[in-house]
């Protein structure tokens, strides 16, 4: 009989064995490598299943007539088809062996899906039918397994024990059981005879396992490898054939298929190596030492890793919201804006916000439209920085007179003086709370609006000034509310002058006003600021009657000329605050306005105009303005040309434009605080 090389070591042949071999000697790789020892222990547990696996594969192959390999036993059984076939074979064999009393053994037809795939639902169904049959024939629940245990190979030991129990049951009806079941019966008979006679001598019982010499040599080899160096050696004492004494225990040892040395333990079987690992005092000490070392190893790893883990793992970056805002500001300050601007910007933004609730109570006619467009504003805050400071200066110069001209429309006879006083009156009315510098921020946006309406930019791709404009519009609801709520009282001419440059039509085109248009504004509008304050007072009173402004009217009539010539910063503020008023009026034109129906909504006007159109618009604005200055009495219905007078700026506007780039930079630096301030103010 040829034996496997891994088995020959039990019979005195020295062959190198790997720890993965199921029949490796009990001492294993040693305690130096704990992980390797754990792996070896797992292999030893698998080794206890190998004898049952081989025995069952031989038994099933004989019953079913199919060659089943021990290594692939679970793969052959996991779809449940062979198990259902086993039921039919066993029932037929029970009928043939016990034709007289077949009623004791339950006979039933078990449904089976023969083409079930491994791991499929049908495989689970076949396995469930087999387990149902096992319960009917009397298999105890302790031997049964779950369907998943077989289908997914989760519990091979329980599957083997169940098959062995079926072999024990069918052996009662004359069916040949597995060899392990035969050995169990021999041992049971031997124990019964020994207990009955009370003798320790061996009783002559036919042994089907193997010859006595082979079994004894295998037991000696396993027990003495490695040699024990203890003072009180714990050895296996031979009593009789297949009977040994280990300490106070009597062991029944059998050889299975000439390869496996099996020990009868309780109601099952174990290999001699596994049994010695559990019950030999020397090996128990070895196991205890191993367990302690494993626990110490695990605790050591956990204790060492806990203090070291914070040092190994890099610290996450500190999440400081202010640092994120500072980074945002630095990225936006790349065009050359000073770093100290955001602080001033915060102050300037907070001041209008503090005054906003006082005047916002008066009305809410203009605010809905601006608030409706506010969601667009935060989308692209960083882009307004792209506009150069020169462009900002040009923007500041251009709209300063556009407001005055748009307000001058009610009185065509005295357009320049009326417009100037109108701007003065609006400035006086708005800036009386001593915050002229605070209004500088909205001034630039108003200039952006006026220039964007009448001078479509050459760089239409930059959409962000619109959003900034809307952002500041919502923050300046007070000025627009005062005029927009009372806008229906304005003359039709004023309405015709304002609806045409609808503040929200092409605001995306703001960023790059041409220098030519700026020059035109300087040339054409240098005259009106020097008009007589008398007509300015008349127009101021006219504005007071039309707009119903309470306190600033008297101030406006008295000092329009002085403020016009003296303080150009205040003129810029007046333009800034007057422009939102005109915007508010444009949003709410009077019912008598003939131009309001022709105004295009913001949602429709999305395509920016080309640079050539910008040139023509500026030229037409210039010519229209000259024509109206020459003939001071055009009808009120012919006010659309006045809308083209908005881009040119006065001398004051040019001067203020020189002063306002810093304010423009402050405006464009940080829009985060502008938006949050508006939100808080709305609450």
Curated annotation (Swiss-Prot):
Residues 210-283 form the GAR domain. Disulfide bonds: none annotated. The modification Phosphoserine is found at residue 559. InterPro entries: CH_dom (IPR001715), CH_dom_sf (IPR036872), GAR_dom (IPR003108), GAR_dom_sf (IPR036534). Its main location: cytoplasm. Interacts (via CH domain) with F-actin. Interacts (via C terminus) with microtubules. Interacts with MAPRE1. The GAR domain modulates the binding strength to each cytoskeletal network. PANTHER family: GAS2-LIKE PROTEIN 3 (PTHR46756:SF7), TRANSGELIN (PTHR46756). Cytoskeletal linker protein. May promote and stabilize the formation of the actin and microtubule network. This is GAS2-like protein 3. The lineage of its organism: Eukaryota, Metazoa, Chordata, Craniata, Vertebrata.
